[in-house]
């Protein structure tokens, strides 16, 4: 354990997640958080007087070469199966979440903690044979901000897809309502069909699993948790879709990195560009999100 920054407002320490992996532990008067340097992956964020916002599986494998289940994995430079990988030999969601990121800067101030991370690579895959650099600026305070900047360092244009794959902690999926989703058309990955905007069958229909949908919207989304009496608002910049996912009991039981009944503790709402987007040679693009939590019950009861 080593203290990287410490002042009157808070501190940031670097600790071991396992023999293989390291993480940053953030402590501040407004918030607590944890970030894995493997994958540049946010693992937790808990504003003061609130419950944990992000879900992390107790069975997550903190090992090189294995994805961490929970927090905000980075899906990049493709989402799901690469369109040119018919046999899925390269796996889902690209290679960014399996790389070791470096800490470029940490700023601990009165409002919160800002962490800047980066990773750079070249010819990481036959499906993506380009030089590239990724940077993240993460702000943890009473709200959370994430800005991912993608730079094409090669001499050729490239195409990317990606998502900020947020696992949101909820009292139960059936208690999570996202009414804005009813206004958007979507592709249902379970049925293989596309649907026009579809009114909710019941007020709590959104979170009932299994669900795997790509909603064609970049509107602000608000997750209302009726039991925990809080809202989680997500705003996004430079994305075209929201991906809504929960595996449900049957699939989760066959996923070793989801602890028993873990699927009953989260929903995924992912700011995404699921289709390939142009990233010109020598140019940069960004994807970003802001998450805000608001309770609508007395503070004395918020951690009950």
Indicate where each model-derived feature is located:
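Active-site/ligand-binding surface loops and adjacent short beta/alpha elements
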Residues: 157-159, 167-241
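Beta-strand-rich N-terminal accessory domains
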Residues: 1-69, 219-239, 283-300
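Beta-strand/loop-rich accessory regions of lumenal/periplasmic or secreted enzymes
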Residues: 66-94, 182-192, 221
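Short, hydrophobic/aromatic beta-strand segments
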Residues: 44-46, 156-163
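Asparagine-centered strand-capping/turn motif at beta-strand->loop junctions
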Residues: 149-154, 293
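Hydrophobic core residues within well-ordered beta-strands of beta-rich domains
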Residues: 134, 144-146, 285
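Extended, loop-rich substrate-binding clefts of extracytoplasmic carbohydrate-active enzymes
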Residues: 3, 13-14, 90-140
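Acidic/His-leaning functional-site neighborhoods
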Residues: 98-99, 106, 204-277, 281
């Amino acid at each position: 354990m080593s203290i990287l920054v410490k002042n009157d407002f808070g501190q940031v320490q670097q600790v071991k997640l396992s023999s293989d992996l390291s993480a940053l532990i953030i402590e501040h008067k407004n918030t607590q958080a944890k970030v894995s340097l493997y994958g540049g992956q946010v693992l937790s964020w808990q504003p003061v007087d609130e419950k944990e916002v992000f879900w992390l599986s107790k069975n997550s494998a903190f090992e090189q070469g294995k994805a961490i289940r929970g927090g905000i994995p980075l899906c990049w430079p493709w989402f799901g199966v690469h369109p040119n990988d018919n046999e899925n030999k390269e796996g889902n969601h690209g290679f960014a979440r399996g790389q070791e990121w470096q800490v470029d800067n940490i700023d601990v101030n009165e409002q919160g903690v800002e962490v800047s991370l980066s990773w750079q690579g070249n010819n990481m895959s036959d499906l993506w044979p380009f030089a590239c650099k990724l940077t993240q600026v993460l702000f943890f305070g009473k709200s959370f901000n994430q800005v991912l900047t993608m730079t094409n360092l090669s001499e050729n244009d490239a195409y990317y897809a990606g998502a900020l794959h947020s696992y949101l902690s909820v009292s139960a999926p059936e208690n999570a309502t996202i009414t804005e989703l009813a206004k958007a058309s979507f592709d249902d990955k379970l049925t293989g069909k596309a649907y026009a905007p579809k009114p909710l069958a019941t007020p709590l229909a959104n979170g009932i699993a299994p669900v795997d949908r790509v909603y064609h919207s970049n509107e602000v989304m608000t997750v209302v948790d009726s039991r925990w009496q809080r809202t989680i608002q997500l705003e996004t910049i430079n994305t075209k879709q929201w991906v809504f996912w929960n595996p449900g009991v049957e699939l989760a039981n066959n996923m070793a990195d989801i602890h028993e009944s873990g699927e009953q503790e989260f929903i995924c709402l992912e700011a995404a560009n699921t289709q390939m987007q142009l990233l010109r040679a020598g140019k940069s693009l960004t994807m970003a999100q802001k998450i805000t939590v608001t309770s609508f019950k007395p503070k004395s009861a918020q951690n009950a």
